[in-house]
């Protein structure tokens, strides 16, 4: 466990991790402070951050399991202690770590008698099992158990539907949220009109990411939500009388991109994350693995630089060029190509 003394800054707004510990493979804890804040700001940030931590961060889970010769979810299999339903519930609890999108396939194929754990899951290299000791089933006889698994990355939760059973496979009620809990508290200090606040933020995660990583992801997601307003031109709305209703146009991401044509400052480009460029999942994952997270990062690379990225194709570069030209009237640096 790491614990640091809290020191109050009276000048620049800054955050700090004051406590960090690993309670188990599937329970990480972190406590952070942000200060100094004006009165009321701590509550505004704390509420928004808590909701973003619990609802906006993506996780990777097993979403479907396929058994051979199983008639329904509540069947029992000779030689296995658990019912099919209990095995599905155990698979639901498996904690995975992955940055890839789309549907991935995995499997379990073992022979008893033995205990089946998360370590027996055969998954793609891009998927990491956080706790390989998690129990799945106990085989009491020399039988074969083969289960086909489907892995997905998403946010929030997904409830299985009765008509979603296909080819002997069973959907799993899935909770994609990697943050188990988040709390915030406020400490006030100072006197009179100079009263200020410190925001304390506590984060518990399931081990697929650290509380610090969760804080970064939640902050980035909140920034993404507000970006459309950053460069929006002010609209003058004239209401002549109560019978005439003026409709305010929605500020879309593409409106904001058009405004960037007038403002190409680095600080603006650093606020645009590649998540917003609507790239195919394959291209997006290649860029993320190369630590290209923002538009500023992307524009810091030439075409040749992108082609050096593992698994990157000419078609991917052309697609990026089209997006940059269409939305930003920009191009990648040419002097290095």
UniProtKB/Swiss-Prot annotation:
The N-terminal domain is essential for RNAP assembly and basal transcription, whereas the C-terminal domain is involved in interaction with transcriptional regulators and with upstream promoter elements. Residues 266-337 are annotated as: Alpha C-terminal domain (alpha-CTD). The keyword Nucleotidyltransferase applies. Its EC number is 2.7.7.6. Residues 1-233 are annotated as: Alpha N-terminal domain (alpha-NTD). It catalyses: RNA(n) + a ribonucleoside 5'-triphosphate = RNA(n+1) + diphosphate. InterPro entries: DNA-dir_RNA_pol_insert, DNA-dir_RNA_pol_RpoA/D/Rpb3, DNA-dir_RpoA, RBP11-like, RNAP_asu_C, RNApol_insert_sf. This is DNA-directed RNA polymerase subunit alpha. GO terms for cellular component: chloroplast; DNA-directed RNA polymerase complex; mitochondrion. Coiled coil: none annotated. It is found in: Plastid, Chloroplast. Pfam families: RNA_pol_A_bac (PF01000), RNA_pol_A_CTD (PF03118), RNA_pol_L (PF01193). In plastids the minimal PEP RNA polymerase catalytic core is composed of four subunits: alpha, beta, beta', and beta''. When a (nuclear-encoded) sigma factor is associated with the core the holoenzyme is formed, which can initiate transcription. The keyword Ubl conjugation does not apply. Belongs to the RNA polymerase alpha chain family. Keywords: Chloroplast, DNA-directed RNA polymerase, Nucleotidyltransferase, Plastid, Transcription, Transferase. DNA-dependent RNA polymerase catalyzes the transcription of DNA into RNA using the four ribonucleoside triphosphates as substrates. GO terms for biological process: DNA-templated transcription. It is an enzyme of class 2 (transferase). It comes from the Eukaryota. It comes from Ceratophyllum demersum (Rigid hornwort). Signal peptide: none annotated. One of its GO terms (molecular function) is protein dimerization activity.
